[in-house]
């Protein structure tokens, strides 16, 4: 998979390395030169920077020294603790870092074959729906012979500095990494989906049930190979880097390096005792300033845990920036968690698999309202439905749906200055079961995301069976940009873009006719259906000019709520729309009755309560039961 990563800027690693070895020169990257242009957007702030190769910084340079560890990393002078925290999380997952650092053994320095070294490295990152292979030379920025950005504990270990350089190249320059987002880096390292969680909402510090539920979700992400980060929000500039009395630092992104339930007690008593404590281990990218509260490295609470359990957890008494704390304390002191879940789409896995739909789209401006695709959020009602629209289906009675929208990063496309993200979000609407054309009026809103100027927005929601439309938007109309929409469901969702506003006119339209009316039929429910020992297992079918829409079966009730809609583009207005009610049975379904709907050219959404009829009867009430229906009709095909 990763050997097929797309070459960034068409730079081929193997070809460039072969050329350097043939010429016996060290690689110099023309696309990311050792100049101030690679450091800053504008100007040359700070001390004079000298670019040096690892061999000029130390005697025995290595990619890794004694393997890779979350303890390897330290933050540099740029405000990129978010990136260092993401790297710390990455370092704890061998299967993940080996994808980001491909063929690491081949890239490692070989003291026995110095002539095989060409000063060139490559790293893989997931960007905007695909893996890209980014090439860098080994020249690194230094001041007084010290690396000024991300660096390792060991002076001769360079993997983190080189990964950071490749990431800076992808972003445009090193300055672009100042004040970035951990969620973005976690996605770029994994191709997963980041879910931000605000710990200040929902009374998590005091509500044990909610806290336990969240811990189980965090534990599941960790146990299935995902990456997690946590932070304490700095409200003001003065808050940045402020140290709390408990030792935690505001404005820092901490890497979560372990999550587990810790058994309390000693010996057999501990084995049979049911009491366990929800614990989480974190690491500060600065490698110091640890938590000093309960369960810190030297706290007496560790006496409650057996020596073997402590050894298994890796508890050490060192000021190395890594520490344990209870999840309750974490919810009390931290304000944000980012869970980057690895979406499992493999059918061979024992864990839950997801079906992923991935679609690229864009917000574009146009003077013609039918071609404009930048309508802004729902606040702008006149233009909202001009945005891109995507339809998908939930095919189970209820399904957990994960939705992510990511805008194309602008940092790497604006060398004259820092590219700002647009404020983006999306709404999800429950629509007719057979909708094939774009929405033009409001329907039931099933869910909605927040609007925020981050690179991506995520929503996890439970949706009942049916068809839905996602409308991704910028907050303000007229803003343009590309985006990637990802929809994850338990079964295939058939997600696709709705491009047409109405049925297209073809050469057959003059012969077969063209729709004169659009009709939306909403069957709300029924009452008084034919008695059954176990209650009716009923469903409805809406029929119109050869097209059918069927509801889900409502089991064990004579007063079902169908809440099903159909939309029909009508050519033969004299023909009525028929709504049939059926009882589902094992061998053969039973007909319970039907109603006919005659529509006016412009029917309002009036509620009709109609008695069921037999198929051949003209009498209004010869069968038990009534059905409640709303009908909306319009001669304008873009009215609904």
Curated annotation (Swiss-Prot):
Q: What class of enzyme is it?
A: hydrolase
* Chain residue ranges for the region called Domain III: 344-496
Give the matching SMART domains.
C2, calpain_III, CysPc
Which Pfam families does the UniProt record give?
C2, Calpain_III, Peptidase_C2
Single GO term (MF): calcium-dependent cysteine-type endopeptidase activity
Q: Where is the active site?
A: 81, 252, 284
- Outline the extent of the C2 domain: 499-617
Q: Name the chain's protein.
A: Calpain-5
**Natural source organism:** Mus musculus (Mouse)
């Amino acid at each position: 998979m990763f050997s097929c990563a797309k070459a960034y800027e068409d730079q081929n690693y193997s070809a460039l390395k072969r050329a350097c070895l043939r010429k016996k020169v060290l690689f110099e990257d023309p696309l990311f030169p050792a100049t101030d242009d690679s450091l800053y957007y504008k100007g040359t702030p700070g001390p004079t920077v000298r670019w040096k190769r690892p061999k000029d910084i130390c005697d025995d340079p290595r990619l890794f020294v004694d393997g890779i560890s979350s303890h390897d990393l330290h933050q540099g002078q740029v405000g990129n603790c978010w990136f260092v925290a993401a790297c710390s999380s990455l370092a704890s997952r061998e299967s993940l870092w080996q994808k980001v650092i491909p063929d690491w053994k081949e890239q490692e320095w070989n003291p026995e074959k110095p002539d095989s070294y060409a000063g060139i490295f490559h790293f893989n990152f997931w960007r905007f729906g695909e893996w890209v292979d980014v090439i860098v030379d080994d020249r690194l920025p230094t001041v007084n012979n010290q690396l000024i950005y991300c660096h390792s504990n060991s002076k001769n270990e360079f993997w983190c500095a080189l990964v950071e350089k490749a990431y800076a190249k992808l972003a445009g320059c090193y300055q672009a990494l100042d004040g970035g987002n951990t969620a973005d880096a976690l996605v770029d390292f994994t191709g997963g989906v980041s879910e931000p969680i605000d710990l200040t909402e929902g009374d998590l510090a005091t509500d044990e049930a909610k806290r336990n539920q969240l811990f189980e979700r965090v534990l599941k992400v960790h146990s299935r190979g995902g990456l997690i980060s946590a932070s304490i929000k700095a409200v003001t500039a003065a808050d940045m880097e402020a140290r709390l009395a408990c030792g935690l630092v505001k404005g820092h992104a901490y890497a979560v390096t372990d999550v587990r339930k810790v058994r309390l007690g000693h010996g057999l008593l501990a084995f049979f005792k049911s009491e366990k404590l929800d614990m989480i281990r974190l690491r500060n990218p600065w490698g110091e300033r640890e938590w000093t509260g309960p369960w810190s490295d030297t706290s007496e609470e560790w006496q409650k845990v057996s020596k073997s359990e402590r050894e298994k957890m890796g508890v050490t008494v060192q000021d190395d920036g890594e520490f344990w704390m209870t999840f309750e304390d974490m919810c009390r002191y931290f304000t944000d968690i980012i869970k980057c879940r690895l979406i499992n789409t493999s059918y061979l896995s024992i864990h839950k698999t997801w079906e992923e739909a991935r679609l690229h789209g864009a917000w574009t401006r146009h003077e013609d309202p039918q071609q404009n695709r930048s309508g802004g959020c729902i606040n702008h009602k006149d233009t909202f439905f001009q945005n891109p629209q995507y339809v998908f289906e939930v095919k189970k009675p209820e399904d957990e749906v994960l939705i992510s929208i990511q805008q194309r990063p602008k940092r790497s496309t604006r060398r004259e200055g820092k590219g700002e993200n647009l404020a983006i979000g999306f709404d999800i609407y429950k629509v007719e079961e057979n909708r094939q054309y774009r929405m033009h009026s409001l329907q039931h809103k099933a869910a909605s995301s927040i609007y925020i100027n981050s690179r991506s927005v995520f929503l996890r929601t439970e949706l009942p069976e049916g068809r839905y439309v996602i409308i991704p938007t910028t907050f303000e109309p007229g803003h343009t940009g590309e985006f990637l929409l990802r929809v994850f469901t338990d079964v295939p969702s058939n997600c696709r873009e709705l491009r047409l506003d109405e049925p297209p006119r073809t050469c057959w339209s003059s012969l077969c006719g063209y729709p004169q009316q659009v009709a939306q039929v909403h069957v709300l429910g029924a009452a008084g259906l034919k008695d059954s020992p176990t209650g009716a297992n009923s469903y409805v079918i809406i029929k119109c000019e050869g097209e059918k829409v069927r509801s889900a079966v409502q089991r064990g009730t004579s007063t079902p709520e169908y809440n099903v809609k159909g939309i029909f583009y009508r050519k033969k207005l004299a023909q009525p729309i028929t709504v049939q009610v059926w009882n589902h049975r094992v061998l053969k379904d039973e007909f319970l009755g039907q109603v006919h709907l005659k529509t006016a050219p412009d029917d309002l959404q009036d509620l009709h309560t109609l008695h069921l009829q037999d198929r051949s009867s003209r009498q209004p009430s010869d069968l038990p039961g009534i059905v409640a229906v709303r009908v909306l009709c319009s001669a304008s095909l873009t009215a609904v």
